[in-house]
């Protein structure tokens, strides 16, 4: 609202909130830091878990940064940017979501200190951009190359990703499953590996223990055999995949058939029966003894299939059909008349088994499966969900190493190395930007400091010891949170893909820079319906944040 000769001039609608300059920056920085502080305690092998309860009473227990932020109903626009950091990190690297968010929060904290010293945001932004660029170069220079067939390194990286999650007791076993699964679906082209992790299916079933989790060299489908007269087990299976219904199709036009005598009705029914029998005969003729159908199977067709001893499954999801094709080598056929013996896939065994009281179809023993399934077991729904998240992280980490062939030491070693090298770089740059680069370097120490804090160690004492040891012994020295001492992380098997660290620095610095660029927040008044809905839910119309962050 402006004033002209004492007369107010309304530019924005009534109820619109506006924060300008330092107020806007402070508010945005505070909101982003609250998000970082929320996930900070989950970082590292000794990190704690969060229990999230939604409006329906559903509970999620996890220490996965991306899941925590995804489950939280966040309103503040700057805080939502931090959620995007976690999502991007998860999508691009698969791990390091908490690291990225914590670094972004610390970069903003250090930036605020510079703003309080009257350093212009543009200078801070320029310094941060230079530092982020230099950090990428430093990470490339300290990364260690590994061969794709180095199973020990892949195993250690997968174990590092699983450590600290609910599945930790079985981390070695789960890491082996993750490595094996990725290696099975990996495709080599011109000496480089490409992994599509959509070809690894995670099927969850409560019951049993985490150690009962299994890798199936094929596909597990949460369906059952359609007819009780069909075989429940078929060895040396020849598999047909049909993307159509085994039913008599109805005409798409509004056609009417006028039947005037019982003979005509009988002829009509016989023709229907004949068409269905021809479909089943075609399946038998090409030599298939197992058939997966994406749509329905008529009762009469079921009868004929059972009579011929063919195992059939209906209403199979499209994604499962594609995985079956990749695992067995079968081709998905749209028109059953086009089915040929060459379209059939093969598997050692197709069997219906009871898992946790429910029937499931196991297609296993595929020769060279390019799609596999990990059947996850665990005592409760929450355990099974957290094991799935741990395995997803492990699988993505192994994928990163196979594709890039580069690793880096974990345990805060990379961040300490970056901090030391960026401090040196800041002196070369000089000017006011030097202060911003030094702030960036200082912000990276939040990772080793948080690892120590979460392990119950004295953060300052531990950090001083680790930095001294790091300068003396080299870039692989980090914090061993179990011993509380500096240690060579490569020797201890704490390994991460370089992609995870590079993406974390990239995402965190970009988010911090974007938030620092904002000097004006104009928030429109919420719609009446939304406001009414929030009255009972403790919602707030404005974006003001309050926190005890120092």
From Swiss-Prot:
Sample GO molecular function, one term? ATP binding
> Which parts form a coiled-coil structure per UniProt?
none
Name the source's superkingdom.
Archaea
State the oligomer form and interacting partners: Forms an oligomeric complex of eight-membered rings.
Under SUPFAM superfamilies, the record lists: GroEL apical domain-like, GroEL equatorial domain-like, GroEL-intermediate domain like
Matches recorded under NCBIfam families: thermosome_alpha (NF041082), thermosome_arch (TIGR02339), thermosome_beta (NF041083)
Where composition is biased (Low complexity), the residues are 541-550
Functional description taken from the UniProt entry: Molecular chaperone; binds unfolded polypeptides in vitro, and has a weak ATPase activity.
Q: Which UniProt keywords apply?
A: ATP-binding, Chaperone, Nucleotide-binding
Q: What is this protein called?
A: Thermosome subunit
Q: Which organism is it from?
A: Pyrococcus abyssi (strain GE5 / Orsay)
- Report the family membership: Belongs to the TCP-1 chaperonin family.
Region entry Disordered: which residue ranges? 529-550
Q: Does the keyword Chaperone apply?
A: yes
